[in-house]
Amino acid sequence: MTSRNSINRLPFKLTFLLQSLVLLFFASCSRIDHKQSALDPKGLVAQNQYDIFMLSVWITIFLFCAVGGCLLYVLWKYRAKSKDEAMEIPEQMHGSSKIETTLILASAVILVILAVPTLQGVVLMNRVPDPNDQATLEKLKLDKSQIEDAITVNVTGKRFFWVFEYPQYGIVTANELVFPASKAVRVNLRTEDVIHSFWLPKLAGKVDLIPGQENFLWFIADQNKIQQR
């Protein structure tokens, strides 16, 4: 009987091993330095979004390991030792109120840990810092000169191409956004036809351009040359 059970479990172990190897193989194919990778931030706003993302990733990994570990322990601890035991219906009972309360409180704490930096990130993305707010500038490690006279770019989404207008300089370009490093850039977004998505993965988040609605985003680049195609 033991030998037959071992033979029956062999395909499952082999399948699990093969699945793990395939998963590791595809994970090794990823590239952090890809031109459009949001995991390689080059600006203040993108760095803030990256930090929030990694915080949620580490919390998710911890919860996955904790819940998975508890599940495996229970499956091993209370497994059926024999066929007769497997046919028995176990005693039905209500769970522990203390455990349920602890899990609810722990979930609330985790939500707060995620909510606070997320809300701060939303505020940061939706408002260019006031150059006269010294406390905010010190918190963000910015100089007043970086925020003053921020560059304005009016972006219009059209079918098959983008139009970039620099009203302060009287310049209009197509499909290429040019700006200096270490200087705040405010991008006003609008569309003349269909819905477009404007995204600078290394600099800021993705914003949708909705017909009849104007949106905006802002960023500060950390380096002089950033190419995205």
Regions found by a protein language model. Give the residues of each.
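N-terminal secretory/membrane targeting signals
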Residues: 1-31
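Alpha-helical structural elements
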Residues: 20-24, 73, 157-159
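Alpha-helical transmembrane segments
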Residues: 28, 53-81
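Non-transmembrane, membrane-proximal soluble domains of secreted or membrane proteins
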Residues: 30-53, 76-229
